[in-house]
């Protein structure tokens, strides 16, 4: 069993080898899979207040919708039986697009955007779903260095200024050690949870992060 806590305003990076269970953990936090053992107490999940930014597939990158339509779809799980977006939802979508710097792209086709622009659109979509917590699965994979740093800067702003808790699965160890407050390392031989400094002093941290 692994044990960890994420509080309001925390920034947790989940790292470790491929196949160690990171994606399974994320799906359990989202309520898509039951935990293999133990329990998950996630008030944000019960309240429907989690924004999720998944890894993109090639088909998703080629999705033929406008930026505005993609962002508004973040409200889908909150609409219930309502088929149309409310004025408040449309206003919030515009606000989130402005916050992420994609407002001027709102009428553009999503599949025509660069990788960095698409990630910002998906993050605006996640904010429409999120009140308390953002969960991101490998958000910088495939991005060029400039787009990567831009995304990290945006996440830092949301975490520090808007007190949004962030849980990010990543293989970008350098970025994780720089941005996170805490590290959850999941390995085939065990796990570690603690601050960045504690992680770097641990056997797992010395193996995976000590060379950086």
Language-model segments: residues:
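H-loop/switch region of ABC-family ATPase nucleotide-binding domains
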Residues: 170-171
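The feature captures the beta-strand-to-loop junction immediately N-terminal to the Walker
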Residues: 15-17
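Conserved ABC ATPase "signature" region
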Residues: 87-105
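H-loop (His-switch) and adjacent beta-strand-loop-beta switch element
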Residues: 182-195
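Helix-to-loop junction immediately C-terminal to a conserved catalytic motif
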Residues: 30
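Catalytic Walker B motif of ABC-type/P-loop ATPase nucleotide-binding domains
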Residues: 134-137
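Conserved ABC ATPase signature
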Residues: 109-113, 117
């Amino acid at each position: 069993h692994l044990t960890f806590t994420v509080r309001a305003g925390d920034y947790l990076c989940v790292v470790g080898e491929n196949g160690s269970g990171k994606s399974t953990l994320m799906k359990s936090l989202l309520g898509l899979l039951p935990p293999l053992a133990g329990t998950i107490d996630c008030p944000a999940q019960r309240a429907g207040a989690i924004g999720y930014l998944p890894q993109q597939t090639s088909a998703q990158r080629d999705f033929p919708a406008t930026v505005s339509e993609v962002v508004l779809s973040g409200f889908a799980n909150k609409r219930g039986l309502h088929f149309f977006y409310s004025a408040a939802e449309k206003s919030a979508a515009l606000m989130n697009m402005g916050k992420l710097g994609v407002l001027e792209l709102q009428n553009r086709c999503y599949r025509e955007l660069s990788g960095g622009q698409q990630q910002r659109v998906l993050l605006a979509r996640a904010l429409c779903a999120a009140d308390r917590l953002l969960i991101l699965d490998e958000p910088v994979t495939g991005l060029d260095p400039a787009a990567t740093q831009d995304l990290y800067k945006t996440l830092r702003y949301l975490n520090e200024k808007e007190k949004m808790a962030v849980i990010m699965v990543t293989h970008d160890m350098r970025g994780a050690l720089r941005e996170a407050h805490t590290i959850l390392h999941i390995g085939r031989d065990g796990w570690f949870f603690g601050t960045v400094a504690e992680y770097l002093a641990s056997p797992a941290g010395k193996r995976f992060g000590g060379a950086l």
